[in-house]
Amino acid sequence: MNNQKYIRNFSIIAHIDHGKSTLADRLIEYCGGLNAREMSQQVLDSMDIERERGITIKAQTVRLVYKAKNGNTYYLNLMDTPGHVDFAYEVSRSLAACEGSLLVVDSTQGVEAQTLANVYQAIANDHLIVPVLNKIDLAASEPDYVKTQIEDIIGIDASEAVLISAKNGIGIDSVLEAIINKLPAPKESSTDILKALLVDSWYDPYLGVVILVRIIDGALRKNMRVKMMRTNSVYTVEHVGFFTPKKHISDVLYAGEIGFFTASIKRVSDCKVGDTITDEKKSCEQALPGFKPNIPVVFCGFYPTDSAEFEHLKDSLAKLRLNDASFEYEMESSSALGVGFRCGFLGLLHLEIIQERLSREFDLDLITTAPSVIYKINMLDGQNLEIHNPADLPDLQKIASMEEPWIKATIIVPDEFIGTVLSLCTEKRGIQLDHSYISNRAKIVYKLPLNEIVYDFYDRLKSCSKGYASFEWQMDVYELSDLVNLRILVNGEVVDALSTIVHRSRAEQRGRALCIRLKDLIPRQQIDIAIQASVGSRIIARETIKALRKDVLSKCYGGDISRKRKLLEKQKAGKKKMRQYGNIEIPQSAFIAALQIGGE
């Protein structure tokens, strides 16, 4: 397709569960991308985990062919994007490849916190936005009220918002006409020299790395020699194509189009998301700006339960990193858990999804350490450090001050649940910044410490609002804080995998909870086991697992008391030796359960 005025590149943005993927299904069905037999629910959500959870994790692309009412045939490139704040990097990449967006809002729920986050990204990318109100067939639908909400909160005109029911296929033709008439075509190509944006990549066991590109200038052809501008790697293009959503092979991709190519690329490191791809012989002079990298904010350790699985874990992480550029990892070792990896994520859901993908797609059984965030340490000698692993925390005597990250959180909640939500935020050391009302719902803006959020905040927010609250956050500032390194000792030995950095006011509560949990999990042995929580040299909590008593007198049937005394003295000496030299074996099941203590 070489005439760009008949191309439209657009994304669908929305809050979770407002009907993005269902609308994508209906658009594919209406344009004949798949026949009725091939259609399934959430057809663009290709991972099992996406369908089970009802969320989109990976942005997907599909080319649709639509004959408009004006008689012309148009080629529509749809980018279906995630809604959850943890996958904002996927959203940003999709938006950079498009000129416009459909803003889908549930007409029974209205504007939610993550709707705001995603629509502001679209506005920052200079997108034209078409509001679409979904679920108008439901009795609770309030389209006029939601239109007013969109105009008041987001500030875009919603008077001509398209009314649809994606589930029942109502209004789908109106959406397609709005895409044609309201969204712009790609800019005309300014040169014949190839310039393409690397939007995404994934690993295929037969083809090597598959690269998704948006062609900005020129054309990408089969057998062409192309260069990655960031790494200067050169490859010969073997296959070129696009998704309908089935894979469709073609010979060329022209300016304005979105498609994929393969080139027997085996080195994962050559494919940097946001890189510029150009012709080896006639290279473009200036690379595209690419994407602003998302910085991981939540960290934890992944350790294989079987040390023989380490290399398999290493290869699996490399393949996942190719498919998810916002995920980072580095090797680390623990005296308790062996060798593993310290991994960085955009949030807790991101962590959970990566963990589940490693389990499902690569059949790995992992131990995951407690999540932590990046702390800034100001040393007495003038050095400034950034750490996210409690084991790396220097001696407290050498530290001048410590800073922790704070976030700015926006919570939208029905007014009947305001009291419980405010109590939760206060409990988490939050500072209220704003409190306003949108009809019968409140918009609350809080400043919260990130390390209070990474454990159980989202679950408790949903629980105390009966699932009605929506939550979106962004990094704000680092502030001085009274932080301590909470260490767990078993019989005087520090268990590094259970160490965590907490605010001093929370240390005793968290330490006591961990000690009680470990007491229930570690099996009794022939000596007393002391489980202690300490801050520096001070013990703040202790639990004791009482010894099992082996009856050494069971084989004595009466007789001289000196024989019994001799056996008891021998047992006593043995226990003394065990206390002196014995190591307590903590089962891995105890580690796994204890590391779930986070929010208690």
Swiss-Prot record:
Species of origin: Rickettsia prowazekii (strain Madrid E)
Keyword hit for RNA-binding: no
Q: Which UniProt keywords apply?
A: Cell inner membrane, Cell membrane, GTP-binding, Hydrolase, Membrane, Nucleotide-binding, Protein biosynthesis
For this UniProt entry, what's an example GO CC term?
A: plasma membrane
User: Which residues are in the tr-type G domain?
Assistant: 5-187
**Catalytically driven reaction(s):** GTP + H2O = GDP + phosphate + H(+)
**Gene name per UniProt:** lepA
Protein name stated in the entry = Elongation factor 4
* Known EC number: 3.6.5.n1
